[in-house]
């Protein structure tokens, strides 16, 4: 049915009205090398390579990276165990994205993408006949069908939330797969199905998918697993027979012959490992370390290079997350009161050397962050939910209170005390108690010991209010399992943000995901208003509509005080041993690590 030329010729043999109707319907269907949310792709068909790469980058050498904790599984698609780092390098997806462009994907496994921009109820991906898995087995439409059926039935909850709107996945032929969706208004879904790594049906036919395993899996991506030291180290080797090594989306990328991850107990031990040249590249997330500890000999003599690489990504919302499933954290007034006890201005000065900006929005550092009072268009989206939403959602965008920066802001703590009284909590006999006399005791769950110094000032201010906050530090496996089961009061989390948000919002904030173990909805939010706004975001036909809808969502989330916002920086802090070549122009929306290359070192034998 997709041979448009023959259809149009046939229609011309019919009477005029019938022919015009057929031509109009056919003209809406597009066959393209790329898929976009809105508008045209930046790179035309036949482009040579992505912009922020060196197409002539040499192949060879190695890249050593770090990871924290441990791992016990090579299956990152399920809600069990702790998956090893880097597994995404094993699997190709239908499309590939450029770190210079958002809202666009280009064909990788897919040679052609067929769709109707005015009807988002379906999309067809036509596969490249040369696509192969690493064992040489052809990759075909049945593998795509198997992947989505398996992830929806046995995969981690995030897949079920993300792809809940898939009605069917059908192999039309060995090289064509059709996705049908339950609604024709979700404009993002035809593109996002192209982002998932495709699994080999023939490999999993004799294996149990939903279990942890250290058996080396088969993939179709640029790397294969070459060595494993369970829980301590995993190494990947560039596949010399990689089927897509010469495709334009891969030119200048995946240049290292070897990529390995060395695991460390915590960030402090990992930093010592970097200083000892046990791995090559470190993204520094501690302001104090960046300001005071990069003064070791390899830095001063130029063997280690420090760089701040700006990006245009919205900042993730990092904060102390409340589990609103639990009393008293299900009370909005209590959550706002606890938020007033975090003195960011003091922490930024005393702990972070003034390096950070307070995060005030779930889309900070972007045009998606709500500002000031709601516009008429935003109010139109919010008004139907006035009775269900906090009044603050209809006023100026909620922002965390500022302090004098002395670590003990009396005005903020008095406001917190008033809110707690409003919620029925009163200070007596040395503790904050409810009407039954039960003291307020909370637990902060942590996995990184470095965060204890950030939590302690919050703990002291809460103690001044009569609240007992204990700190529980767990190993990675215990921590992940506690979060999967929502077994916590407070924890540190980071909610990713996108310049083109969509289906991922169902996992982060959707009501259905609130009670699904392992989902991204850590805070337990259940809100019909939020569900309606997410639906509108996924259906937005224009950028203006998307921005307005995200502004409204941002206002609602901020007014709920679901977490205590922390801080961000608009750049990457990178320390790297001087073994690498980098493209002249860094990407706008990422670090671009896959486009680096090995430039060599005379002492590589000793450095391994």
Residue ranges: model-predicted function:
Residues 109-111, 116-118, 134, 139, ...:
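Aromatic-rich, solvent-exposed beta-strand/loop patch
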Residues 53, 57-58, 78-86, 112-157, ...:
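Aromatic- and charge-enriched surface segment that lines or borders ligand/interaction sites
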Residues 70, 88-103, 149, 193-253, ...:
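Gly/Pro-rich hinge or "lid" segments in bacterial periplasmic/extracellular proteins
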